[in-house]
């Protein structure tokens, strides 16, 4: 079934005679795609019949002609084929193309892993983004191991997983796909006999048939705790093992290994974070009960991991007392062990480990978590993870002191590091809520306690005075004699649960309280007062939690420096920051700022906000930690993490960074252990590079800043002019995209809109970006750039394109901005988008708006290529270019089918099968694009 493997005209292999490794990798990728395509084709024919397979192939070939040549005859043929299909056949066709996208992604991912391995085993020079490269750079700059260890003592690199609903695949589907990936990996790594090759292919066939017979779509809506459980899967896949391994590898490189003194050990700097189960902004289903359940699920996952590792460690530490000496600490642990087996009487390390296991099992039982294996006897629960770690450290010291350090460097070392990184809470859970909810809650409490306050009517200065007075007061603001609204009761219940979590799991369990849509100083003080009510802040100025403003809109980004300047000048708030080690975190929102002002202006205002915040924090003597709320798509701040971090203005990283990992990006980065390790290494290397090796980077020349300011203003005008100022644009958007149908997918627990309106302002950023990706316009990732470049060149004929090209070559920020736009535009298709435009019933509106979009697209591509000095999109990114050419012949038909189904769905009586077909196309297109939300 070779016709269902590659595009009709096979892509030419790269002409790299001097690069045999790259050529071999390319060949192997094509072979893997051929293999999986053949197996899928056989599956479609066997399960659905030859007629369905022939239909798939006919649609694919016609779609290629239309896409490649803009062939109007092919377009008519395609429409005729689609019109003639039954609803049942349509669903089968969609599933075939969707699964090919999934399988092509697997082959690509395995090829990336293959190339990473080749780079490591062949002894080639380390590439940018690898720690080896960054450490070599540091050595060349005269930065030694001791200085680097000092850096990591206060460093923080924290990927924060969120449940943003952009991962459309079910976990069952992902599990099967991981099985297929493992089988491909086996073919790569293991020297198989002919019989084993046959067995491997048979297993692949079973997996693909199982995939074909598995529901692609969720039949029920996810609950928040479902999302929590899904998120925890990535700890099993990657984090629980790779986070400790990365620390240990870096420690070895810096000389803090086996026999190192305590002060030479590398501090744990890589900390996992999560919003899943703690993000209440717009999600009424995140309650105190859900917060409690989330923390319990997280703790259960990490304690079971520790117990499993202790069980294995006990098996390994069979050292006999007459063959190895032990320390007094280990002797005491062995004597306290409830393990009285005569077989282990002379195996003190095993006795010590079984005692630790018993104590940890008792800890799990105290937290109402069932352990995997019953302990050998009863023991006292650990009061904290520090006590658990102290016992592990005692075993480590004894082994090292008695010539068994090589044993200490195995499983025990990894477990000690895991305990340090994950504690008993696994990941730090952020709480997040909208500032408007805090405002209403405080207003109700204030009006009950101070009836004359009229909190909602008074100005910002009066609010600040009232709130700071409350922070100084030891008297509670709430009263058991007042009946509060359900919203206020719910908010206070969540905060009380957070305080209880600190007592149960430690302060690291919930270290941040984030305020979305922060617009003023009072927004932060309101949260401080609420936290004081539950004991997380006391009147003396000590705080057990960080209060984090989130600046999201263009206007709020522009005001962020002034807000933080005034806030840090308030003694009551400054004391809270000082009690937290003099560190203040600020979160920057990439998604809403993009929806508000467009891609160019969002990127520029974020950059300027960082520069302003750096200056303000230096003035106040406070350490700034930035938390980047980036999405998967470029329209929501996505793009290569290394480039994004290194392109930050000088002083923005300063050793600490937090960054969101959302939706389908979590899966692509962390479902495979090797890929996950590589991505964690990239974050670490970029943080080190931006902090130590580029701290005094020369600021961009004034001309560049001025040009960027002008480009931003021009792009802003074009973007706002289309999205917010064009009559009928809202109608065009709702008619020409799948925004309505997206809400029928069971991909998340959160509603798509903040309010029940059709206004763009009220729409969440994710469905906004997701919808434009589905219709292949990707408008949030580029619109306005072309107009801005044309207008700027017209206003500066003396500088023109050469000046902008110098700006691109010399300024990392501008280079990263354009590189991301290059990626977005390469995935767009005006031909396909024109078919979605035909769904708009008003022909005049359709012609006017799509005409503007088409003209802006051409202007943006022309401007981008001129500035980059390229002849075509992705000229500087051959890997992505190749990827798109492999996958898109199977992606484009899904768009054509989706348009046809949308037309039927919107013009006929409701049909469950047609709606299911639309949902399947959304799934398949999302998989093909890879970062669509």
Swiss-Prot record:
In terms of InterPro entries, this protein maps to:
PEP_COase (IPR021135), PEP_COase_bac/pln-type (IPR022805), PEP_COase_Lys_AS (IPR018129), PEPCASE_His_AS (IPR033129), Pyrv/PenolPyrv_kinase-like_dom (IPR015813)
Q: What is one process in the GO biological process aspect for this record?
A: carbon fixation
- To which species is this protein native? Rhodopseudomonas palustris (strain HaA2)
Task: Describe the task this protein carries out.
Answer: Forms oxaloacetate, a four-carbon dicarboxylic acid source for the tricarboxylic acid cycle.
Q: Pfam families under this entry?
A: PEPcase
Family per record: Belongs to the PEPCase type 1 family.
* Active site annotation, chain numbering: 164, 595
Cofactor dependency: Mg(2+)
One Gene Ontology term of the molecular function aspect: magnesium ion binding
Catalyses:
oxaloacetate + phosphate = phosphoenolpyruvate + hydrogencarbonate
- Annotated EC: 4.1.1.31
Any single Gene Ontology cellular-component annotation: cytosol
Q: Tell me the NCBIfam families matching this sequence.
A: PRK00009.1
Tell me which positions the record assigns to the signal sequence. Answer: none
Q: What is this protein called?
A: Phosphoenolpyruvate carboxylase
Source superkingdom: Bacteria
């Amino acid at each position: 079934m070779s016709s269902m493997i590659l595009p009709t005209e096979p892509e030419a292999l790269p002409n790299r005679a001097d690069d045999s490794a790259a050529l071999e990798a390319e060949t192997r990728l094509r072979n893997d795609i051929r293999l999986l395509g053949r197996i899928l084709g056989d599956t479609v024919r066997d399960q659905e019949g030859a007629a369905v397979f022939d239909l798939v192939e006919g649609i694919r070939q016609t779609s290629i002609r239309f896409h490649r040549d803009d062939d109007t005859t092919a377009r008519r043929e395609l429409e005729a084929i689609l019109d003639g299909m039954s609803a049942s056949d349509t669903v089968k066709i969609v599933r075939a193309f969707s699964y090919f996208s999934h399988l092509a992604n697997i082959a690509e991912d395995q090829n990336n892993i293959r190339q990473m391995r080749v780079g490591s085993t062949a002894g080639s020079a380390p590439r940018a983004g690898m720690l080896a490269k960054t450490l070599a750079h540091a050595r060349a700059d005269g930065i030694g191991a001791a200085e680097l260890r000092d850096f990591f003592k206060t460093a923080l690199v924290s990927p924060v997983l969120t449940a943003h609903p952009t991962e459309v695949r079910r976990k069952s589907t992902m599990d099967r796909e991981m099985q297929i990936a493992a089988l491909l990996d086996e073919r790569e790594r293991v020297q198989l006999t002919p019989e084993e090759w046959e067995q491997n292919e048979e297993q692949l066939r079973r997996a693909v048939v199982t995939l074909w017979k598995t529901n692609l779509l969720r039949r029920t809506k996810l609950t928040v705790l479902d999302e929590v459980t899904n998120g925890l899967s990535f700890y099993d896949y990657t984090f629980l093992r790779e986070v400790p391994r990365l620390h240990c590898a870096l420690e070895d490189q810096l000389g803090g290994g086996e026999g190192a003194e305590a002060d030479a050990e590398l501090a744990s700097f890589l900390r996992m974070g999560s919003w899943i189960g703690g993000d209440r902004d717009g999600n009424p289903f995140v309650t105190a009960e859900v917060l409690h359940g989330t923390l319990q699920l997280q703790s259960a996952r990490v304690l079971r991991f520790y117990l499993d590792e202790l069980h294995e460690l006990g098996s390994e530490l069979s050292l006999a007392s007459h063959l190895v000496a032990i320390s007094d600490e280990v002797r005491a642990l062995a004597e306290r062990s409830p393990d009285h087996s005569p077989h282990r009487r002379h195996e003190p390390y095993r006795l010590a480990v079984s005692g630790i296991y018993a104590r940890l099992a008792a800890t799990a039982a105290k937290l109402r978590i069932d352990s995997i294996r019953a302990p050998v006897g009863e023991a006292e629960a650990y009061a904290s993870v520090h006590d658990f770690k102290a016992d592990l450290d005692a075993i480590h010291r004894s082994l090292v002191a008695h010539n068994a350090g090589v044993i200490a460097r195995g499983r025990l070392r990894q477990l000690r590091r895991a305990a340090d990184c994950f504690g008993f809470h696994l990941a730090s859970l952020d709480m997040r809520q909208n500032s408007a909810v805090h405002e209403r809650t405080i207003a109700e409490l204030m009006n009950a306690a101070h009836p004359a306050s009229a909190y909602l009517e008074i100005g910002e200065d009066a609010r600040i005075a009232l709130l700071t007075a409350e922070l100084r007061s030891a008297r509670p603001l709430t009263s058991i004699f007042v009946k509060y609204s359900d919203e206020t009761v719910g908010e206070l219940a969540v905060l009380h649960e957070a305080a209880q979590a600190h007592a149960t799991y430690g302060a690291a369990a919930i270290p941040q309280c984030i305020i979305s849509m922060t617009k003023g100083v009072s927004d932060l003080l309101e949260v401080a007062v609420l936290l004081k009510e539950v004991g997380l802040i006391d009147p003396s100025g000590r705080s057990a939690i960080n209060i984090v403003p989130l600046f999201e809109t263009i206007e709020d980004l522009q005001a962020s420096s002034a807000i933080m300047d005034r806030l840090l000048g308030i003694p009551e708030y400054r004391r809270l920051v000082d009690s937290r080690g003099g560190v203040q975190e600020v979160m920057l929102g990439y998604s809403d700022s993009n929806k508000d002002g467009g891609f160019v202006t969002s990127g520029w205002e974020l950059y300027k906000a960082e520069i302003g915040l750096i200056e303000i924090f230096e003035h106040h003597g406070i350490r700034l930690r930035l938390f980047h709320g980036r999405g998967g798509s470029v329209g929501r701040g996505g793009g290569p993490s290394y480039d994004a971090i290194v392109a930050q203005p000088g002083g923005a990283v300063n050793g600490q960074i937090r960054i969101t990992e959302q939706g389908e990006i979590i899966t692509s980065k962390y479902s495979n252990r090797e890929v996950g390790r590589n991505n964690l290494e990239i974050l670490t290397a970029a943080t080190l590079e931006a902090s130590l090796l580029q701290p005094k980077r020369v600021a961009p020349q004034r001309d560049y800043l001025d040009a960027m300011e002008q480009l931003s203003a021009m792009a802003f005008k074009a973007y706002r002019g289309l999205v917010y100022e064009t009559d009928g644009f809202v109608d065009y958007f709702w008619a020409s995209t799948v925004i309505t149908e997206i809400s029928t997918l069971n991909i998340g627990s959160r509603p798509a809109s903040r309010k029940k309106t059709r206004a763009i302002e009220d729409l969440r950023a994710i469905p906004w970006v997701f919808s434009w990706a589905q219709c292949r316009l990707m408008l949030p990732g580029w619109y306005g750039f072309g107009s801005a470049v044309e207008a700027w060149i017209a206003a500066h004929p003396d500088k023109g394109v050469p000046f902008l090209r110098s700006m691109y070559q010399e300024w990392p920020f501008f280079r990263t901005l354009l590189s991301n736009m290059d990626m977005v535009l390469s995935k767009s298709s005006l031909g396909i988008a024109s078919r979605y435009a035909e769904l708009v019933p008003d022909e005049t509106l359709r012609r006017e708006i799509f005409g503007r979009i088409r003209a802006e697209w051409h202007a943006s591509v022309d401007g981008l290529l001129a500035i980059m000095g390229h002849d075509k999109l992705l000229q500087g990114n051959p890997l992505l270019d190749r990827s798109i050419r492999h996958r898109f012949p199977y992606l484009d038909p899904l768009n054509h089918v989706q348009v046809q189904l949308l037309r039927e769905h919107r013009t006929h009586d409701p049909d469950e099968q047609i709606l299911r077909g639309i949902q399947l196309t959304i799934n398949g297109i999302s998989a093909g694009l890879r970062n669509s939300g």
